[in-house]
């Protein structure tokens, strides 16, 4: 249990028996609002709580007066060395140094398992991510969402969830018809015809490889086939080939999905119809007309009666159409059917990773899941923004009219998988990220992945060169008394809290920020040793101080390795 969690538990124990003006806290919903956290300014103490502010709403008493009462009670908590109150009623704590020294011992005993917490309790979570259209190999623009989804899955597994990684193959609809027509042209090209790639078709040269496969298997036989048979053959061969390319690209990123679900197979299994029938049974479908969509003013638009889902009953802005004018299902109908299929497989918690251009789908999908599951299932939709690819500050063109684009393979060959994975997590997922090819290979503190890996490598260099140290139970850690050493220990103690909040908010970038902060504090401490021999990790003729600092350094290594493991990044023991 982390220091913050320990103090929170003690505070709750005190509040359960405390009587203030005949008010005793027995309502757990009140305690759920209790915060024990680290202040932004370390001068305000090691931890703070909002307990007095919460209780003032129920006791109808000035929070400063309540805080003074609480201070008397909380002062007996053995881990607390100092306590004070600041307006409007926050209570700040300083924690005994012995508690922080115990953190070093705990980390060295648990090693990379330090900070592991289990609040998932084996609950199943479905994470759908990537789901790129199978119309071509993955370009580097897909990498951010792919890495985010994979690392989030790792993180949720770390905190005790059973995670299923799923990829939805969009192998039905207009884009597949365009793919078939584009491949057929390339097939004709292989046969020697001069072709013209029309507007709206896929121009990529990779399609010529599929044309060659078709020629090897069928010769010129496809030319004489009827349209439906030829379409089926080209479709099946193309999708198989392109999904193989996509899986290979994902493997280059270190990503492997557990399940691949086909949209066309769901249609064959009448999942859409079954989903619609369920909504009809729930009386959540009606026939009506919608207002003209925003942004279409001036366009020749005519209202028509159509099948609508009552999504506004579940928090959406408008009700949603399920059928097109020609009677075929809308994209939304297929989408909610897919989530109905997930629910039918027993998933009560789903996470969906989408590009930020899909922000309009958030409310409607949440509404659909709530309706289909009677509120028993939830979906968390995580949006990722674009990545600007730069080379020493200059924009890198992502695509050309020829259909060529910057591939995942290109980037990994240039900078390496681990660099790509780390850099993609250096910003909150819905914030635009700059990926500069020149900067991500710099060996400087301006390159976060180098900075973190260098800290880990420095730890191992130190261990390799250190003399034999004392057994940990024989070390007097009170010799670690400098401001920089205590700051680093307190930072390491936050690791469990960082893992927990990152998992609960589905924000793995918090771990990236934390690892950079740990590396920065460690490098700073190392730098002080370059200025003063007394601050070096290995101090001649002082085996106790050397041992204490080596165990502190090893703690840094274990925490960094633990974080990088969540990212599926190999921690380096030496820099090359």
Swiss-Prot record:
One cellular component (GO) term of this entry: cytoplasm
Example GO biological process: arginyl-tRNA aminoacylation
Entry EC number(s): 6.1.1.19
Keyword Aminoacyl-tRNA synthetase: yes
A GO MF term: arginine-tRNA ligase activity
Catalytic activity of the protein: tRNA(Arg) + L-arginine + ATP = L-arginyl-tRNA(Arg) + AMP + diphosphate
Keyword set, alphabetical order: Aminoacyl-tRNA synthetase, ATP-binding, Cytoplasm, Ligase, Nucleotide-binding, Protein biosynthesis
Primary site of residence: cytoplasm
Enzyme kind, highest EC tier: ligase
Subcellular location: Cytoplasm
Residue span of motif 'HIGH' region: 132-142
Assembly with partners or alone: Monomer.
Family indicated by similarity: Belongs to the class-I aminoacyl-tRNA synthetase family.
Protein name: Arginine--tRNA ligase
Source species: Ehrlichia ruminantium (strain Gardel)
Lineage, top ranks: Bacteria, Pseudomonadati, Pseudomonadota, Alphaproteobacteria, Rickettsiales
